[in-house]
Amino acid sequence: MTLTLNRQLLSSRQILVAFSGGLDSTVLLHQLVQWRTENPGVTLRAIHVHHGLSANADAWVKHCENICQQWQVPLVVERVQLAQEGLGIEAQARQARYQAFARTLLPGEVLVTAQHLDDQCETFLLALKRGSGPAGLSAMAEVSEFAGTQLIRPLLARTRGELEQWALAHGLRWIEDESNQDDSYDRNFLRLRVVPLLQQRWPHFAEATARSAALCAEQESLLDELLADDLAHCQTPQGTLQIAPMLAMSDARRAAIIRRWLAGQNAPMPSRDALVRIWQEVALAREDASPCLRLGAFEIRRYQSQLWWIKSVAGQSETILPWQTWLQPLELPAGLGSVQLTAGGDIRPPRADEAVSVRFKAPGLLHIVGRNGGRKLKKIWQELGVPPWLRDTTPLLFYGETLIAAAGVFVTQEGVAVGENGVSFVWQKTLSQVKAG
């Protein structure tokens, strides 16, 4: 057996290898080290993710360090914590791994992982168990986009048995994760109990599922082409999805558009039931409603006749953040980012006797620049087109008990700089907040 060097891998000169220390990634790294010897211009690094789930995790790190030192491969060790609500341990671990991969990738690097044919078969069967359509049944692609670069799986056509033969022939050492024998995990149940029976009855079952996955991928790619114009017509430059153009579509066409829109938001694929609920409970909710459907750590909302995909963030209406050192940035709660006052702008700086704070609600009638008369904050949000989910998470700058400005939205008449150098109230948002508005 030799490594399948596809064109993308052959053209890559900087490679980051996901290295768990197990059989699969050990064989992959070994073959890439050999390939590097034949191609001196190739830069090879490895990353090991420490999940903290096993008592042996520290020993696995040491093993990977020893192997990489022996093979002269720089190793990055990323320690992660699993705390994503609504996901099982398997999904949490996978999400944490790929987040670590994305953080570690250097410009120009590609990520290479060691999934093989048996993994592909298990992925297909898991998708089948979930009732997935062609997108889910496509399983894993040999080359896919990831974190602004490429994710390459060069062993996808090889069986685990072939990898083991390679490892034994070359005297390789690898670790065995004890959790791989726990069949309470779905993938392990398939690997230990189901697939061996299928392979015993039909020896080429894994190859057949790989062909089916490839056919599903072809069909999905064709649908992407056929629906590209519809999606472009429905999607706004801000990444939201207009509801009106979808009203006349068939249920199947509309569902396909919504799936592709969500895929563009890097959202997990919703179930068929979730797609129905997105349309019936969110898109078609009564006009005066503010519908919301939560999917994992995200929400689908409707606002201004558009669907929005946003990160779930707890409201902060009762939060008051004293800002005594207002010359320095202030970190906001709930992953909302930070705020700072920067030189140059139309907001007056605070006087020495004014305590500065950041809040998320303001009582009474407010007088803002550009509007005549006083208005309650709720009315101002509505007039300025601020989505409901941002109204109690948008930072408000106070001097004493006086509202001065809403970050990026408005300045009050009491906050205007007159005859003095002004400042700007700048909100450094997280990525999810930027996408949400």
From Swiss-Prot:
InterPro entries: Lysidine-tRNA-synth_C, Rossmann-like_a/b/a_fold, TilS/TtcA_N, tRNA_Ile_lys_synt, tRNA_Ile_lys_synt_N, tRNA_Ile_lys_synt_subst-bd. One of its GO terms (biological process) is tRNA modification. The keyword Nucleotide-binding applies. Pfam families: ATP_bind_3, TilS, TilS_C. It catalyses: cytidine(34) in tRNA(Ile2) + L-lysine + ATP = lysidine(34) in tRNA(Ile2) + AMP + diphosphate + H(+). GO terms for cellular component: cytoplasm. ATP binds at S20, G21, G22, L23, D24, S25. Keywords: ATP-binding, Cytoplasm, Ligase, Nucleotide-binding, tRNA processing. CDD domains: TilS_N. Its EC number is 6.3.4.19. It is found in: Cytoplasm. Its main location: cytoplasm. SUPFAM superfamilies: Adenine nucleotide alpha hydrolases-like, MesJ substrate recognition domain-like, PheT/TilS domain. It comes from the Bacteria. GO terms for molecular function: ATP binding; tRNA(Ile)-lysidine synthase activity. Ligates lysine onto the cytidine present at position 34 of the AUA codon-specific tRNA(Ile) that contains the anticodon CAU, in an ATP-dependent manner. Cytidine is converted to lysidine, thus changing the amino acid specificity of the tRNA from methionine to isoleucine. Belongs to the tRNA(Ile)-lysidine synthase family. The N-terminal region contains the highly conserved SGGXDS motif, predicted to be a P-loop motif involved in ATP binding. HAMAP family: tRNA_Ile_lys_synt. This is tRNA(Ile)-lysidine synthase. The gene is tilS.
